[in-house]
């Protein structure tokens, strides 16, 4: 079986994206005998759905996990719910903007992850990795990706979710802005630990048919 790990390319004024670095670092690794496949998503609304759908259909992973950066957050934040809503004042990397359109015109207004995020937050904190539950993935590309990931994972009775991470310390230092950050090594360890925990507890969370 496979674990599919999505990260994002840089976007807007952020010239580096820790989610890309994490996905690349964990690509090809093995977690509980499952191979991790890291895939980098473009920050473009019109491209990510086909890419996510295609990869999940081809690989049929036991777990699909998206990660993205949330500038301003100081902790790793597993997301509970994705909403069927697109809103972006600044636009994506192709300049595309949305003002409240649905991601899926026929889809549910919101979809909960089937990953035990509450317990995951406790686990990360117990292992010295600052974490907090998030009830909003926003309305930009991360929420968009999360909605599609969970929707598609349900089709294959597999696990799907999303985790936000802070900016990485080395980049925050280079741009010389007083913004929360975390070391890249800590975030890589946190995501790896998250996948181990999710896979260990996978049977009780596979509830969709």
UniProtKB/Swiss-Prot annotation:
Keyword Nucleotide-binding: no
UniProt cross-references to InterPro entries, sorted A to Z: Peptidase_C15, Peptidase_C15-like, Peptidase_C15-like_sf, PGP-I_bact-type, PGPEP1_Cys_AS, PGPEP1_Glu_AS
Keyword Protease: yes
Location of the protein in the cell: Cytoplasm
Catalysis performed (reactions): Release of an N-terminal pyroglutamyl group from a polypeptide, the second amino acid generally not being Pro
Gene Ontology biological-process annotations: proteolysis
Chief location bin: cytoplasm
Positions of the catalytic residues: 79, 142, 164
GO cellular component: cytosol
Sample GO molecular function, one term: pyroglutamyl-peptidase activity
Record key words, sorted: Cytoplasm, Hydrolase, Protease, Thiol protease
Enzyme Commission (EC) number: 3.4.19.3
Quaternary data: Homotetramer.
Function: Removes 5-oxoproline from various penultimate amino acid residues except L-proline.
Family of this protein: Belongs to the peptidase C15 family.
Descriptive protein name: Pyrrolidone-carboxylate peptidase
Source organism per UniProt: Saccharolobus islandicus (strain Y.G.57.14 / Yellowstone #1)
Lineage, opening ranks: Archaea, Thermoproteota, Thermoprotei, Sulfolobales, Sulfolobaceae
Gene: pcp
